[in-house]
Amino acid sequence: MRAPGHAAIRWLFWMPLVCSVAMEQLQRDPTLDYHWDLWKKTHEKEYKDKNEEEVRRLIWEKNLKFIMIHNLEYSMGMHTYQVGMNDMGDMTNEEILCRMGALRIPRQSPKTVTFRSYSNRTLPDTVDWREKGCVTEVKYQGSCGACWAFSAVGALEGQLKLKTGKLISLSAQNLVDCSNEEKYGNKGCGGGYMTEAFQYIIDNGGIEADASYPYKATDEKCHYNSKNRAATCSRYIQLPFGDEDALKEAVATKGPVSVGIDASHSSFFFYKSGVYDDPSCTGNVNHGVLVVGYGTLDGKDYWLVKNSWGLNFGDQGYIRMARNNKNHCGIASYCSYPEI
């Protein structure tokens, strides 16, 4: 049997989306016409035909309603964070996660804990590696499940700065294209895992900079050039499963740390400010991000997390996630960092 073409695949994806939206909301709100047009212009949205725009409009209205209700509840003290509309407003949760969250935990994830903790060590109350120049600018992964690659290079960028004094954006595309061999288990835009990316860099003898191997948001043939090597990795360190104290110590004493989180909720997609604490967030991680610090805001402990969804996400690309809250969203479950 011949495999379905792109048109058939698009149809199979599109029809359930249309039906789902139609069942929930049959008619758009004409009082929002101006704001819809303004939002489209702001985020440069274009649709192939009126039918697609109608469906996207209904999804946008549903998300807008969620945002308005949440912020009303926030004003009444029911939440510790605010949400706001962004460029993902015309997408369903399933679409966003399918395109942008593709963390693939190895079936037999190593259980060996290599992080050495010093329980008597005094740690600072607040850490922000951005202030020490160890964090590059926020990236945008686009419609490619390369979250794991951006998380991995982010951790290595911090180590490179601490080791050499140079802050260099490393190539996520290098990992997308070249660490997809069977022995690593990564699938490029189809997902991957940070420690497998670190292992590739170790085996390969290095990784290029983004300047010489730029991000394309698609799977391409590996064309790594050792002459352009920008960083190396000697080994990687894994933290104890679910141990927030160990994560705090690692972030405070070692640098930015790669982690996995559950990022499957509207509250996460549209986060804007405050400390993200959603009771529906689970320990089933599906998205790779980078912890670059921690602190306390209005009496609530948080992890400072760098995402790879561009500056329109969250607080200029960052989110503060609840800390010391029963491993909220699984943030301390799969943590690692590289060493040079």
From Swiss-Prot:
Glycosylation site list: 120
PROSITE patterns: THIOL_PROTEASE_ASN, THIOL_PROTEASE_CYS, THIOL_PROTEASE_HIS
Domain of life: Eukaryota
Keywords on record: Cytoplasmic vesicle, Disulfide bond, Glycoprotein, Hydrolase, Lysosome, Protease, Secreted, Signal, Thiol protease, Zymogen
Metal-binding recorded as keyword: no
EC number: 3.4.22.27
Tissues showing expression: Widely expressed with highest expression found in non-skeletal tissues. Relatively high levels found in skeletal tissues. Expressed in spleen, B cells, dendritic cells and macrophages.
Cystine crosslinks: 134-233, 144-189, 178-222, 281-329
Protein's job: Thiol protease. Key protease responsible for the removal of the invariant chain from MHC class II molecules and MHC class II antigen presentation. The bond-specificity of this proteinase is in part similar to the specificities of cathepsin L.
Name of the protein this chain belongs to: Cathepsin S
Species the sequence originates in: Mus musculus (Mouse)
